[in-house]
Amino acid sequence: MVRYRLTVEYDGRGYCGWQRQDNGPTIQQSLEEAAFRLCGVATRVHGSGRTDSGVHALGQVAHLDLPRAYGAATVMKALNAHLRPQPIAVIDAAEVAEDFHARFSAEERSYRYRILNRIAPPTLDQGRVWWVARPMEAAIMDEAAQVLVGRHDFSSFRAAECQADSPVKTLSELRVTRVGDEIHVFARARSFLHHQVRNMVGTLALVGDGRWTADRLRAALEACDRSAAGPTAPPDGLYFLRVRFPGETAAPAKAGPLEAAPLGEAPLKEATLKEDWR
């Protein structure tokens, strides 16, 4: 058997998440069906993260074992041919050692959440952003977000159905930046609790529109009680951005609709936004 590492991009709308299940189509199922059409053997595809229904990915990493060496380029082209016309694409493939595991070898995972912060609703990005019409201040959100960085009990930001053994996680980075009409929340950690990013975003949104203060956010964290924090942000705006493995460095952030602006740079100042808000 030959093991291949895949980098996968997908639009999560219309799928019941990553993990194969009986009640609807999933990303894992689609990849496994494409792999079967390639090699004629039932193949399990393992992912770095199990994204929920409606959550997207720009850099999900997966691995699978094939019965012989096809060549990475052939694997990528064949899988993409069998995946069409689904909104799933293998954007990179590489042969790896048999001890590589997409989930257990990962050292760090990064997510980006997109909030469309304008009065007009989304058109082309419908289902790909969380639309919030009321004015929000990214700088205030970013300052408050630093309360959550570090090693904490994140019970207040954990889904009731979370299966993790412990609610304690180390959040390496949490940054909030404005990119035009959008507010981007970037989160980086070795691993996350179920719904942790969406629950943090939903709570930070309350800070951004002035309903909460940073002190209240801190109190919510320290309460270790889900009811103490804010609502769960919808899946639409969440993107599994990238995975880092041993020997790799985090990719630099790029300004753009799906990436962060470089830290310290604000493409649109908060004061300008307030003046132009209609």
Swiss-Prot record:
InterPro entries: PsdUridine_synth_cat_dom_sf, PsdUridine_synth_TruA, PsdUridine_synth_TruA_a/b_dom, PsdUridine_synth_TruA_C, TruA/RsuA/RluB/E/F_N. Pfam families: PseudoU_synth_1. This is tRNA pseudouridine synthase A. It is an enzyme of class 5 (isomerase). Disulfide bonds: none annotated. Residues 253-278 are annotated as: Disordered. The gene is truA. Residues 267-278 have a biased composition (Basic and acidic residues). Its EC number is 5.4.99.12. Homodimer. The lineage of its organism: Bacteria, Pseudomonadati, Pseudomonadota, Alphaproteobacteria, Rhodospirillales. Keywords: Isomerase, tRNA processing. Belongs to the tRNA pseudouridine synthase TruA family. It catalyses: uridine(38/39/40) in tRNA = pseudouridine(38/39/40) in tRNA. The active site is at D52.
